[in-house]
């Protein structure tokens, strides 16, 4: 296994703290289901630092949210946040893509959009199945939660996460042409 660099560990810590604290805030759309802008953190940090960082930020951050909120840790949803973060970080594996350097193309943006959407759907279905099978939650309730959470996460991803990530890459692209004068 590769060692985690100090920079990556710090990024995971900051990302998890931001995701954990911002995860306490949201707009209710279904029973125990919220539109949470914090999901944008997973998109941005995943794109910046890769799938391992995205996974750990999702896992740790969601655990922080559940712990602070006091409703107990819902492991299916914690794992789903990790899955989403991992999916968002897959863009980092594309050759030539870098938010930090502002290097990307339309194919990269499409890849991030597709892997992000697929990751959200897989993660939320996993969380719902986990709640039914392991936690003994009623099927009808979970169907509503899964539909609500999927819609909410897709909205946040498309309205906040993706545009912020593209904006960061664009702003960094402007600086790639700068040269140091002697």
Swiss-Prot record:
Superkingdom of this protein's organism: Bacteria
GO cellular component: plasma membrane
Main location group: membrane
Chain segments annotated as transmembrane: 9-29, 40-60, 71-91, 114-134, 142-162
Keywords, sorted A to Z: Cell membrane, Membrane, Transmembrane, Transmembrane helix
Keyword Transferase applies: no
Topology of this chain in the membrane: Multi-pass membrane protein
Location of this chain's protein in the cell: Cell membrane
Family of the protein in this entry: Belongs to the UPF0397 family.
Name the UniProt record assigns to this protein: UPF0397 protein BALH_2375
Organism classification: Bacteria, Bacillati, Bacillota, Bacilli, Bacillales
